[in-house]
Each structure stands twice: as structure tokens, then as C-alpha cells.
Amino acid sequence: KIEEGYYTKNGMEKGNWSFWDRDGKKRLGKKIDYKTFKNIGLYKHLDGVFLVTGPIDGLSTAYTQAHGAVRGGRLDGPWTYWDSDGLLSAKKYYDKGTPRGQYTTYHPYGHKLADGVVNGIDDYGNLIKDGKWLFWDENGILKEEVHFNSGKREGLTISIVIAKGCSEIV
């Protein structure tokens, strides 16, 4: 069971609903429309935490479920995203609506694709990466270590090239 509640004669959801999280824990909440995200969708309020269904991160990335807190109308604290198959796709941290902190994306097979720290978004909407970032290929093999300072590559970049069974650090 995922959710349970009542509908009006017009088919509109009414009153408090019960929801079950991924661990089977029952939560109470109320379905509401919420416009914190870039695309409009239906959001379910659960004890101060929101479960989100539908695309929420632009047109090219569709998350079908997200879980995290919204405070003061903005994303805040840790958020976890799952893809349309229910597989983990990202873990992100927000500070009053701004991405800030650990930022990890995952391949549908479960291994990491990118992992590092962000300190906000620049004027063009790009993440401001800081410190060491690691990038893996679709097979889960580490392919690059890049160091950033305020969103710009800085210092050592290590690329790992794998060809015909041998690897080389460039």
C-alpha cells in the first residue's frame, strides 16, 4: 500500500490521507499543490517532509519520487531522488533552497556516477563545484578525479583510461 484517503464526488482528493514510506512506515499528511519545484506536479505533505511525484529537475531528468524537507517554501536539508523504476538516482543537500553540500548522482545499476561538494548555483544555473570530485563511467569504473575551486577546475585532474584490459593514469 502506498496511499489511502477519500475523494469528493467530483473526484478531488479530500482531507487527510495516509501514506506509507519505502520502509512501510505509515505517515499522515495532506495532498497539496506546491510550486517549489521547476515543473508543476502533485506533492504530498508528510509530517513536514514532502514526497514528490513527477518530473522535478528540468525536462531532461525525470525523477518520479523525491523525499526531503521543505522549510519556508524552499528545499532544505538532505533530499533523496528515485527514478521511474524506484532505483536511487541522486542524493543532494540544500540550504534554504540552494544546493549546498554533498551532491551524489547514481547510475540505474546502483553505482555512483558523480560525487562531490557544491556551494550553490552560478548566474548561468550551473552548480558551483568545490574540492575533489569523482566521476565514474556507466560500468562503475572510476574515470576521473577533478579538483574545483568556486566552480572552476583548479590544480590536478586525474583521468583514468582503460583500453584492452589495462589502465593508465593520464
Regions from the PLM with identified roles:
Residues 1-170:
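Glycine/tyrosine- and acidic-biased, solvent-exposed loop/turn segments at the edges of beta-strands
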